[in-house]
Amino acid sequence: PLPPMDVQKKIVEECEKIDKAVAEDNEQIRNIEVTISKMMLEVEGDAQKIQKLCSAINPSKSDVNSLEKSMLVSFVEMSSVSNDGYIEQTVDKPLADVRKRSYTYFAEGDIIIAKITPCMENGKCALATGLKNGIGFGSSEFHVFRANAKLINNVYLFAYLNRKEIRSKAAEVMTGSSGHRRVPISFYEDLEIPVPSMDKQMLIAEKYKGLMKDIESLKQQIANASSRKQAILDKYLK
């Protein structure tokens, strides 16, 4: 049976408040994304190719040859990388289980970016942090960038690459058959980006991290909307 009309009205009113809050959260996210885009577009500095700013691009697995085979490392599936710029989940695996296979190797502080469609266009990329023993392996469909800390801040580099503008340019140069198109590493190697002073880079990096944290909080609030509505129903109907 339907609840009394006054109860129905209260349920609708409270649920509409949640819908309004979700709409406001989405608007805030869009505004923050515009702020980030504008911040990166306004960066001034000498233009330099990424290959000159990295100590390694798609680093060799030989880096870990001397490590114990039984040592646990982080394994990252493509599905475990969000479209929002972070790793959502890792699985600890022995180094021996992942080193000899076709998985991509990376380390703490490296940048991983999906190279295959549609993952790249969707924004699957991350700054690899919190890796088990500082080592990660993952999908063969990642490109990996290791910033030269003397030349560029890794968060600044990630902030510059994790943008729709860069993804649009990357999509234009994809090669391969439909459904298996990939961004060639040469696109990133030859990509020129502005490199301000290290102090300026660090300021931008800190601001970027703060803005991304704000986006993450807002998205969490949006994700909780359904459970909040269910709580309203439970309050009035149980």
Residue ranges and their predicted role:
Residues 128-130, 173-177:
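Short amphipathic beta-strand starts and helix->beta connectors
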Residues 1-6, 135-143, 175-202:
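A short glycine-rich beta-alpha junction/loop motif
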Residues 51-65, 76-111:
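Sequence-specific dsDNA recognition surfaces
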Residues 41, 55, 114, 158-162, ...:
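Generic alpha-helical structural context detector
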Residues 69-71, 128:
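Short Gly/aromatic-enriched secondary-structure transition segments
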Residues 102-104, 108-162:
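A short beta-sheet element
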Residues 2-65, 194-205, 209-238:
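Non-catalytic DNA-recognition/assembly elements of restriction-modification systems
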Residues 166-169:
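Periplasmic-binding protein-like
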